[in-house]
Amino acid sequence: MLNNTILHAERELYLTLLAWAQQQPNAYEWLTQLPTWLNDIKDKANYAHAPAYQASVARLPTLTVDNVQLNSDILTIDAQLSDSERKQATALLKQLMPWRKGPFKIGSSQNEGEQAEPIFIDTEWHSDWKWQRVAPHLGNLKGRRVLDVGGGSGYHGWRMAGAGADTVIIIDPSCLFYHQFMAIRHFVGSADAHDIGRYRTHYIPVPLEALPDNSQLFDTVFSMGVLYHRQSPFEHLQQLKGQLVKGGELVLETLVIEGDANTVLVPHDRYAQMNNVYFLPSVAALIGWLEKAGFTEVRCVDVAVTSTDEQRKTEWMNYHSLADFLDPNDPTKTIEGYPAPMRATLIAKK
């Protein structure tokens, strides 16, 4: 069951890529693969929950939206919301749990007359905290084409649009995250549109390695929380580089450990209960990796230990979270005995 939200969003994506292709032939390969990318994520044979997720998005109530704040810590859709609409929307949005990246708020902040309390999607991650750490160090996003790799529900992609990006394309192969994005798109509507009416924020449900090599379409590429999941970090860095225009900016955020340029942790089995973590370099080692991959002007702009206030269990993500993955007797270590999660953000030029 597809509703107008998903169909219209996909049409806007197609028209955006078509406009690019008219100026840059590299975008034609994206256009030719787009139908396959979009059809695969809806295929029940590949994703058993896809029909249920589509139905949840299709049944969301249509609200009168007064304002959308894409550049606030809580991505806020200021809309008229009755009690019945609140109950309906909350139930449907909770069918898209777990919500990991956010937060989001839907409803009126005035609470006057018939208005219900806003819906607050309190996600597992305070993704706004990460954005606060990253944003001051970015080049100006105004008018730029941006690729957000591993964008989850799309929170950071919306923030990039709010910061003035001309076009943001979020990629992530998760069927759930794709439909979470579409649920938020349902309420955002055309609030992020250009003057000519084209949406600026789009989502393609594929991993980075599915994209055409060496597209060179983007002024800024973000890879946040992805590198440590890659079995070949240098291949990932080369793929990121291939999507950038010459002189473009890479924003890389990943797990790191203390140490010198020769220090890299390779977890034996799991790290913080994740079985798909392969390499945790020191900041110095990571700088060396980026330089070896051909990036220049590499700089580390932030290092932060992840706290149980930033990543935690909530009403909207009621599974295990960071507190369950740390040593109960020593929170500076994971349950496996490794250093607790610490994240660094590096910025580099192609």
Curated annotation (Swiss-Prot):
GO terms for molecular function: methyltransferase activity; transferase activity, transferring alkyl or aryl (other than methyl) groups. Keywords: Transferase, tRNA processing. Its EC number is 2.5.1.-. It is an enzyme of class 2 (transferase). The keyword Disulfide bond does not apply. It catalyses: carboxy-S-adenosyl-L-methionine + 5-hydroxyuridine(34) in tRNA = 5-carboxymethoxyuridine(34) in tRNA + S-adenosyl-L-homocysteine + H(+). Coiled coil: none annotated. Belongs to the class I-like SAM-binding methyltransferase superfamily. CmoB family. PANTHER family: METHYLTRANSFERASE, TRNA U34 CARBOXYMETHYLTRANSFERASE. This is tRNA U34 carboxymethyltransferase.
